[in-house]
Amino acid sequence: MRLYKMELFKLFQNKIFKIGMLATTGLLFLYFWFAEVGGEISTVDGKFYSGYEAVQMNRKITEEFEGDLTDEKVNQIIEKYGLPAKLEENMPGWRDGNFLNDFVTRYFTNGAWENGVLPTERYFLWETELGKAYDEIGKTPYLAYTTGWKVFVEMLQFGLILGSILIICGVSTIFAEESQTKMLPLIFSTEEGRRKDVPAKILASFTFTIFIFMWFVLVNFVLCWMIYGLKGFENISWMVLSQHMLQPVLFLKYLGILLGLAFQALVSLCAITLCVSAYQDSSFGAVIIVAVCWGLPVLIRMFFGGIIWLIVDSMPIFLVMTGIVNDIYEIWYIVLGINVCFAIGCLVKGLVSYKTKQFA
């Protein structure tokens, strides 16, 4: 336990970690405020709102209609707010819409701002793909201001990419630094060092990784809850995220799979980093090699398919991407299994390499 605490202290007291934690958290705040909140727009009673004001206005008008979604409620929204019809070149979304009539246009008309198609036809709930999806699972759609969850999922990917960088920079030094500073002979000269040094380093590294995962998830959750609110989680993910999925999946199930894959992504990245660190005699060299290993699957995926595609999708950089659940939903447990086996293999390989140095 003493060695574990010492290793954990070294990881958290590292200047690179302290500076990196402040920088990445700051970047997360900036991205949230300027890219997410700053991009919100809403038009109510002819008045245009943007940024935080738009969020507040959208939340306010949605409260009036919150509840089970019916054709009558859709008609009331259209009567009160109309349907949006204004588009601007190279600008996303309806420029004269709000959360409610944007929602109605997307699911109950033929309008689609992505394709520049104005709404000209109106559909009943039972005629829509949304209605059919809910009939398939035997539930009723619940109208609520779900943008908070949509932003949470978008922010999660950005936050965990930043967290991955912190893990690479922090954990890469855990073994390599001992070789670089010529401390290995001293560590292995004691009985405690020979028996407990490696388990302490590994346990400290995974604790460090779990902390980083929880930090970015928690910060993201609090930001979205405070500004957007987090309602509508009882719906299917398609309705919450405005992204079509091949089959209706409840958002909570989608979120559970997403967080589980993201957690395993960071844990496996930690295992890969430990393996490289055990082989390297330089902290800088370890960081560079791990960074290359982390980003290389993106390049491989561009040129290969088939079984290679499946293996590449199980790598850490892809498991933190929000679109991964839709891509691998039918086989997510296979992808997770590949990742777990790969992580265990890396950890064992690194452990053997580091132990070999004990007898060198």
Regions found by a protein language model. Give the residues of each.
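Residues that define the loop-to-transmembrane-helix transition and helix capping
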Residues: 15-18, 195, 283-284
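Central hydrophobic cores of alpha-helical transmembrane segments
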Residues: 21-25, 284-297
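Membrane-interface helix starts
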Residues: 8-23, 289
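Short helix-to-coil transition segments within interhelical loops
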Residues: 188-194
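Juxtamembrane non-transmembrane "cap" segments at the membrane-aqueous interface
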Residues: 226-237, 296-315
